[in-house]
């Protein structure tokens, strides 16, 4: 089997495609969360702290500038993204559980077979 054919089979497997879609959606979701944090949450936090721009907070040690505010903002970004993904997964799991708990509709064939079984059981008990 050629290398190109093997790669094509690998790439067309469902889990690889699912992973690619998840990565693209994750990047898009990250942009949304970053906009939320940068545009809404951090300015509100800055207002609560007296109008301070948290991302710009830093201190200098010798010639090195330690940008701890930027680090703090990235930690907050991570926490919000992780929490949002957690909530999304919980919602998906809840919907899947609901779907699994729903009984399958009884087809006419199954209903007929059930009636035949019940009739046979009643007739055999009379013998």
UniProtKB/Swiss-Prot annotation:
Signal peptide (UniProt feature, chain positions): none
GO molecular function, one term: mechanosensitive monoatomic ion channel activity
UniProt superkingdom: Bacteria
Cited Gene3D superfamilies: Large-conductance mechanosensitive channel, MscL, domain 1
Localization annotation: Cell inner membrane
Cellular component per GO, a single term: plasma membrane
Keyword Cell inner membrane: yes
TM region(s), chain numbering: 9-29, 32-52, 75-95
HAMAP family assigned to the protein according to its UniProt record, in alphabetical order: MscL
Family: Belongs to the MscL family.
Role of this protein: Channel that opens in response to stretch forces in the membrane lipid bilayer. May participate in the regulation of osmotic pressure changes within the cell.
Protein name in UniProt: Large-conductance mechanosensitive channel
Native source species: Legionella pneumophila (strain Paris)
Encoding gene per record: mscL
